[in-house]
Amino acid sequence: MNYHFNHESLADFSSNIRKEWAVTNGIGGYAGSSIIGAHNRTHQGYLIASFHPSVSRYMVFSKTNERFCQMGNTYDLTTAMHSDHRLAEGQKYLQGFDYDGTVCFSYSAGQLSFKKYISLKPDANVSAVAYEFDNSGAEVEFTITPLMNFREHSESS
């Protein structure tokens, strides 16, 4: 099953935070979040591993946050609702969301466009996040911050 959402349908945080995706690894683990990249449940992340299938799941890889500097401008692509209800609205740079068994977020800001892919290895507790960049030529300093964790998947951190 394939899904596509374009920029116009992704721009609003509140109307998209409840639209979710999920990918499973076949042994009880999974990845999942919203189509704008912000988690809205304690059990969402890029790898919720099942070490003892069906009874024991742990959040081990929550997500990645991206930001970059180009030509003196900083672009923070983080999308999140913080505990004080402050929003980080990186989804305003989101050009598309695609799901075909692999998740793909397409972003564009400044003179940089890039795609972020998220996938799980079948039959293993392994998550992959890959990036594909299209830069117009201006130098870019790109920072990826992985948010790791180790907690029971329904506990809050």
Predicted regions mapped to residue ranges:
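Terminal accessory carbohydrate-recognition/targeting modules of carbohydrate-active enzymes
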Residues: 1-157
